[in-house]
Every structure is written in structure tokens, then in C-alpha cells.
From Swiss-Prot:
One of its GO terms (cellular component) is ribonucleoprotein complex. Keywords: Ribonucleoprotein, Ribosomal protein, RNA-binding, rRNA-binding. This is Large ribosomal subunit protein bL20. Binds directly to 23S ribosomal RNA and is necessary for the in vitro assembly process of the 50S ribosomal subunit. It is not involved in the protein synthesizing functions of that subunit. GO terms for biological process: ribosomal large subunit assembly; translation. SUPFAM superfamilies: Ribosomal protein L20 (SSF74731). One of its GO terms (molecular function) is structural constituent of ribosome. It comes from Staphylococcus haemolyticus (strain JCSC1435). InterPro entries: Ribosomal_bL20 (IPR005813), RIBOSOMAL_L20_CS (IPR049946), Ribosomal_protein_bL20_C (IPR035566). Belongs to the bacterial ribosomal protein bL20 family. It comes from the Bacteria.
Amino acid sequence: MPRVKGGTVTRARRKKTIKLAKGYFGAKHTLYKVAKQQVMKSGQYAFRDRRQRKRDFRKLWITRINAAARQHDMSYSRLMNGLKKADININRKMLSEVAISDEKAFAELVSKAKEALK
């Protein structure tokens, strides 16, 4: 039986890796061995940072809510506690958007939270 080297399959696989490495600097986008390593590392970064992004956005929303709450003489933790006691269910993403875009509505939420804390 003749030897089968699988040239087209190997070429296609390598071509796919090089295509994934498009935009990388230096040898990382031209040489297969280096490109393969970088594509694998990039995949690890992407996996990790998809989770990190969720944490980063939550931190951003909390920072924005805290800044807006302090303009109304209230801390973030007291505001969230007051909203929970007032039975106002609004998530941090929406609350930060309200704090940025609609100052009157946010002031109303703060006043309801203050009433619930009394």
C-alpha cells in the first residue's frame, strides 16, 4: 500500500490557523508554529476576559450609582439597602443608566430609598 501523507488536510489546517492569526505582529501571523501558539494563547485570553468583562461592567455600574447617590447625600450601600426595603427591584445596570440619563427619576428613587430606611 502506498504511503498517504495527507497534504491537503495538513495544508488546510495550517491555513486555518494562519487565518486566525491575521493581524498579529511579526512572526506570529506568518510562521505556523508561532502562530499556533499565539492563537491558543489568544483563545485563553478571550475565555478569561469574557468572564472578566462581566466583573468590570458590574464595577463600573456600582461606581456610577455610588457617584450619583453621593450627590444626594447617600452612600451606595445605604441606597441599595433602602431600595430593597422599599421593594424596588431594579438591577444595577438599569439603575446606573437612570442615574446618568434621568436625574429626576434617580432623585425619586433616592427619596423612596430614604423613606424606606426611616
